[in-house]
């Protein structure tokens, strides 16, 4: 089945005991799990980028009625199926890209979107598509680089204002042209401000931040005029929302001339 990235405990046998991040992803899960009910009875879960199945298995372990794990890598899917079957968990694993999420019917009570965002060449598109599958809790995690601080920013700036772009806490992402950590699929890595700003832009409300790379969110304003933001964008109908007293061409209508 090849080398494992998830260090699973399969009946006392660990699949990646020498992982460079330690007992990964259990080290993250121990901080995140406190935000998830002990019982998920009757709930559905979508695990996007499921890898070896760690999070799918943990959600099923809590009694989720239906868990679907998707990934684009057959090696990881085979590992996940093996782990779930060996541990006696009925979990559906399927080959599917984040860009194909619309092919999966319905929505899910929990969407796990962890360890995927920074691997996407089109990360905001991937996030918007993932949000469409969330009927309830949305769990987001991304590698972060740059400042871990956040700041307060105006809702608009004039064309001539540019000093904020030099502030390390301003929302920003780093583009990786070739490789990072020997991985050519590490495309975009946000700072903390950018991660939180993009979650809000996708219509999510941040509920908690249990781990430095992870946020627990709920859908709040994912629709405009009854349609998802990404669908409006594809249709060429995503006009900016004009705030009261705001001139979208660069100034305030209430400003003294």
For every predicted segment, state its role.
Residues 1-107, 114, 156-157, 161-163, ...:
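Conserved N-terminal segment of class I S-adenosyl-L-methionine
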Residues 74, 120-121:
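A structural helix-start
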Residues 99, 108, 112-113, 121-251:
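S-adenosyl-L-methionine-dependent methyltransferase catalytic module, highlighting the catalytic core
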Residues 117:
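Conserved SAM-binding site of S-adenosyl-L-methionine-dependent methyltransferases, i.e.
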């Amino acid at each position: 089945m090849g080398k494992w990235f998830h260090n699973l405990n399969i009946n006392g046998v660990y699949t990646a005991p020498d992982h460079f991040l330690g007992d990964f992803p259990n080290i993250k899960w121990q901080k995140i799990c406190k935000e998830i009910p002990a019982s998920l009875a009757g709930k559905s879960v979508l695990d996007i980028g499921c890898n070896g199945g760690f999070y799918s298995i943990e959600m099923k372990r809590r009694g989720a009625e239906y868990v679907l794990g998707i990934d684009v890598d057959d090696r990881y899917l085979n590992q996940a199926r093996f782990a779930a079957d060996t541990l006696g968990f009925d979990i559906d694993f399927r080959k599917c890209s984040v860009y194909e999420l619309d092919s999966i019917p319905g929505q899910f009570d929990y969407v796990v979107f962890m360890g995927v965002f920074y691997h996407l060449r089109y990360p905001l598109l991937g996030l918007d598509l993932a949000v469409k599958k969330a009927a309830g809790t949305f769990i987001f995690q991304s590698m972060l680089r740059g400042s871990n601080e956040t700041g307060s920013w105006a809702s608009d700036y004039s064309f001539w204002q540019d000093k904020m772009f030099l502030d390390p806490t301003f929302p920003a992402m780093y583009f990786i042209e070739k490789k990072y950590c020997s991985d050519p699929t590490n495309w975009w890595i946000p700072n903390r401000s950018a991660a939180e700003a993009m979650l809000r832009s996708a219509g999510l409300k941040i509920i908690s931040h249990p781990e430095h790379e992870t946020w627990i969110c709920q859908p709040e304003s994912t629709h405009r005029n009854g349609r998802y933001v990404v669908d409006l964008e594809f249709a060429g109908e995503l006009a900016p929302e004009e705030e009261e007293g705001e001139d979208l061409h660069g100034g305030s209508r209430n400003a003294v001339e």
